[in-house]
């Protein structure tokens, strides 16, 4: 008995402290209300019970009842038939309270019944068969036809969201799809493979079977329908013309038509793209596709031009890939020959025989090479002095080779001859100067001061450019001529070209330097042989002998070198949705000493990657996110296994390619939006959307809609452009309060992402154009005094109840003499 009373006490306490005074969920006073009911539910279900206040005794229901909605005298609102959203999605009713005389004493108030959708309709194609055509080489992804289906279910719910898919392509060659369909719009276009392969000569006809499913195609219980699509492949006349040839420096009036392009259908808008970014682009195109050169061209300035012709629709969107236009500028003879230097100097020994070659004289012509306009002819037109006779020299008419023409020269006759050479092409002539110096005969060979320069030991990390040895040879021929000048060559031992000898022209001293890194592993000991020789040939009977050769031994010591990477930066490109555990790249290094190399990662701050220590293969270990880091950079450390454990580093850059995985959101914080109450006219405000995915060259194209259908009678969202939209009121009958308006934003990506954002709009009294909120108690929020009063009242009621319970318990004890508490204690 006591436990039952305590249980009742607890329930009563909870009721008093927790639920007293709250309005019921399924009943309440007469006021405007909105109810949501799923279609297809069994009839005669109670929706709500309205309570009438005297003198009201009954209710009257009017409006769009359609004979479905009824109300009893006691205020029970119910429906008598199954609701069908496709017949009527929203029922607007009026409910009034009547007195016993049938007069309205309260209301009428609006009652809105929203019929919620269920998936009870199958999507249906508008046609059982579609026909379309596409040009070969059309731009992939550009729609050339659409298939359309309808579904009577609510398009704002998954029930009415359609998903298109190509299920069969005939013929399907090599299992390659040539066509693709936009899953949401039904737009059919070519795949990249189809753009390249389709040929009306090989296969002019294709058939597709296309299906459409509701529930976004994501539910196994979704309904579907199919249709047939016949596609004809037509020839594409949007082709690049043959390369054009234009003679330079044309004097005809410009512009001059040089070629033409043509789109497959009328109405295209043509333009040219200056691919090479020339400051003055000398070409233009008209709207017939005719391409013109607008000014004379200069081949010596630019011998060819490459640019693109594009065709766009009336909205400025490309109809296909641009065509490459190639123009070759044909040479004319508009440049005279030029001398390579003010004076060309040759040397000849005084004992040279008749016909000996002195040198090759050359000039230059800026006209096109290997063309008649640039073929040069040489002729000697003057000699100074003419001693011992004129015409001592000959020159090859086309080769420019200068030879002795009559006899050997003597320095005592003249140490120098000045020749004038006429250089000509088919139209122009130029005079150039040639100086021939007569030098002593080369009858002395260079002689090394030492034949053996000993040996030297160097570490393999000796710096490039270091001088490791100085060698010296002498020549007794005439100083500062080609007969006495010494050139040093390494004729034995340096097969890899790691060394070089640089000669001082004043002293003929040779400096042996390191040209490439030394390598102990391939050449630990090298025997080097040097040769000293003259640029001028030796006279007959004189030959280089052992005096012109010297030797040197180079020993290279080992240096424990770090592992070597073939490159300092390794890069791989992967999609950001790459699965965990996927191999994303490989890094390799080689140890010069042949030791095994172990790999590890450094600066792997996000822990996205791991590396196989043996192979250098790199794998993903966590979800990748381009919005967090578009290029993830880590260091790869290669360490010797054994030895001195030396290490080296390289960089691995993982470039993350974007997938559409971020829903749209508001571009900034839109708190503080308000309208002055009351509205004198419908108002509007503008907001901007963005998302965190990588944006293409074209700006994003978001679509906007209200997040709830019930808001459509009060609000409207209209798109301004791809990123901005306008939220507008549809009337002025708003209460002075805060409205939270959900906005549905779709990015139209692949796959599409949707986000629901909320705009809080306040309707308030305004002072000087700003929202005015007077200080004071707000309706519905209790004051401190009210809270204290409620607590005191609650505790008072609890105290009374406790007192009643304990009195009752005491009374029960008195009435029960067998109770242990009523028996006297025994001593």
UniProtKB/Swiss-Prot annotation:
Residues 22-786 are extracellular. Glycans are attached at residues 148, 183, 249, 418, 545, 573, 721. Residues 808-827 are cytoplasmic. It is found in: Cell membrane. It comes from the Eukaryota. Disulfide bonds: none annotated. InterPro entries: Cadherin, Cadherin-like_dom, Cadherin-like_sf, Cadherin_CS. CDD domains: Cadherin_repeat (cd11304). GO terms for molecular function: beta-catenin binding; cadherin binding; calcium ion binding; integrin binding; proton-dependent oligopeptide secondary active transmembrane transporter activity. One of its GO terms (biological process) is calcium-dependent cell-cell adhesion via plasma membrane cell adhesion molecules. Keywords: Calcium, Cell adhesion, Cell membrane, Glycoprotein, Membrane, Metal-binding, Repeat, Signal, Transmembrane, Transmembrane helix. Liver and intestine. Residues 29-127, 128-243, 244-339, 340-448, 449-565, 566-666, 667-776 form the Cadherin domain. SUPFAM superfamilies: Cadherin-like. One of its GO terms (cellular component) is plasma membrane. Its main location: membrane. The chain crosses the membrane at residues 787-807. Residues 1-21 form the signal peptide. Pfam families: Cadherin. It is a single-pass type I membrane protein. Cadherins are calcium-dependent cell adhesion proteins. They preferentially interact with themselves in a homophilic manner in connecting cells; cadherins may thus contribute to the sorting of heterogeneous cell types. LI-cadherin may have a role in the morphological organization of liver and intestine. Three calcium ions are usually bound at the interface of each cadherin domain and rigidify the connections, imparting a strong curvature to the full-length ectodomain. This is Cadherin-17. It comes from Rattus norvegicus (Rat).
């Amino acid at each position: 008995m006591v436990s039952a009373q305590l249980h009742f006490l607890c329930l009563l306490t909870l009721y008093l402290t927790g639920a007293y005074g709250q309005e019921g969920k399924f009943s309440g006073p007469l006021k405007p209300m909105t109810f949501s009911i799923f279609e297809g539910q069994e009839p005669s279900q109670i929706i709500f019970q309205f309570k009438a206040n005297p003198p009201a005794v009954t209710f009257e229901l009017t409006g769009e009842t359609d004979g479905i909605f009824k109300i009893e005298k006691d205020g029970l609102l119910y429906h008598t038939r199954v609701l069908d959203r496709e017949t009527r999605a929203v029922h607007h009713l009026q409910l009034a309270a009547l007195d016993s005389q049938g007069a309205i004493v309260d209301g009428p108030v609006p009652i809105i019944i929203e019929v919620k959708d269920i998936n009870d309709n199958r999507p249906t194609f508008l046609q059982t068969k579609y026909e379309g055509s596409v040009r070969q080489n059309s731009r992939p992804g550009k729609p050339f036809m659409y298939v359309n289906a309808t579904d009577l279910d609510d398009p704002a719910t998954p029930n009415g969201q359609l998903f298109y898919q190509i299920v069969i392509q005939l013929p399907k060659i090599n299992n390659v799809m040539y066509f693709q369909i936009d899953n949401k719009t039904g737009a059919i276009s070519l795949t990249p493979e189809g753009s390249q392969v389709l040929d009306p000569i090989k296969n002019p006809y294709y058939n597709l079977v296309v299906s459409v499913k509701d529930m976004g195609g994501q539910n196994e219980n979704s309904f579907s329908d199919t249709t047939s699509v016949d596609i004809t492949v037509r020839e594409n006349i949007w082709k690049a013309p043959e390369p054009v040839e234009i003679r330079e420096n044309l004097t005809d009036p410009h512009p001059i038509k040089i070629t033409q392009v043509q789109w497959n259908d009328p109405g295209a808008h043509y333009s040219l793209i200056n691919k090479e970014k020339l400051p003055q682009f000398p070409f233009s195109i008209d709207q017939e596709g005719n391409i013109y050169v607008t000014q004379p061209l200069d081949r010596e300035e630019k011998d060819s031009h490459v640019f693109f012709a594009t065709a766009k629709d009336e909205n400025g969107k490309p109809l296909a890939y641009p065509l490459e236009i190639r123009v070759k500028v044909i040479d004319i003879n508009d440049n005279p020959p030029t001398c390579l230097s003010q004076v060309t100097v040759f040397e000849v020994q005084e004992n040279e025989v008749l016909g000996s070659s002195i040198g090759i004289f050359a000039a230059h012509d800026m006209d096109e090479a290997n063309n008649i306009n640039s073929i040069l002819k040489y002729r000697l037109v003057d000699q100074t002095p003419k001693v011992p006779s004129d015409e001592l020299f000959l020159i090859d008419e086309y080769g420019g080779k200068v030879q002795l023409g009559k006899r050997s020269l003597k320095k005592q006759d003249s140490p120098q001859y000045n020749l004038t050479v006429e250089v000509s092409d088919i139209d122009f002539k130029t005079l150039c100067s040639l100086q021939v110096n007569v030098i002593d005969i080369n009858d002395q060979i260079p002689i090394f001061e030492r034949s053996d320069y000993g040996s030297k030991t160097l570490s393999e990390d000796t710096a490039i450019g270091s001088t490791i040895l100085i060698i010296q040879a002498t020549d007794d021929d005439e100083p500062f001529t080609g007969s006495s000048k010494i050139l040093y060559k390494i004729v034995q031992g340096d097969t890899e070209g790691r060394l070089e000898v640089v000669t001082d022209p004043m002293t003929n001293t040779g400096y042996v330097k390191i040209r490439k890194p030394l390598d102990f592993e391939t050449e630990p000991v090298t025997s080097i042989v040097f040769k000293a020789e003259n640029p001028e040939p030796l006279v007959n009977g004189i030959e280089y002998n052992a005096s012109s050769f010297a030797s040197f031994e180079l020993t290279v010591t080992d240096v424990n070198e770090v592992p070597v990477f073939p490159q300092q930066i390794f890069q791989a490109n992967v999609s950001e949705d790459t699965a965990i555990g996927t191999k994303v790249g490989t890094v390799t290094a080689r140890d010069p000493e042949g030791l095994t190399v172990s790999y590890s990662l450094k600066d792997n701050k996000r822990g996205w990657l791991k590396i196989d220590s043996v192979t250098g293969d790199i794998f993903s270990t966590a979800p990748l996110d381009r919005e967090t880091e578009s290029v993830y950079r880590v260091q790869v450390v290669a360490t010797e296994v054994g030895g001195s454990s030396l290490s080296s580093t390289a960089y691995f850059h993982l470039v993350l390619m974007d997938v559409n995985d971020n829903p749209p959101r508001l571009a900034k914080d839109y708190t503080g939006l308000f309208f002055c109450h009351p509205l004198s006219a419908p108002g509007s405000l503008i907001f901007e959307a963005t998302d965190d995915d990588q944006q293409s060259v074209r700006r994003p194209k978001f679509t906007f809609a209200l997040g709830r259908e019930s808001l459509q009678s009060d609000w409207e969202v209209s798109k301004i452009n791809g990123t901005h939209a306008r939220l507008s009121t549809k009337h002025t009958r708003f209460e002075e309060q805060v409205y939270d308006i959900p906005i549905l934003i779709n990015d139209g990506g692949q796959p599409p992402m949707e986000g629901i954002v909320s705009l809080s709009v306040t309707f308030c009294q305004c002072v000087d154009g700003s929202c005015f909120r007077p200080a004071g108690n707000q309706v519905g929020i209790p004051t401190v005094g009210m809270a204290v009063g409620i607590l005191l009242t609650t505790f008072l009621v609890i105290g009374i109840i406790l007192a009643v319970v304990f009195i009752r318990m005491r009374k029960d004890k008195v009435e029960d003499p067998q109770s242990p508490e009523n028996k006297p204690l025994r001593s």
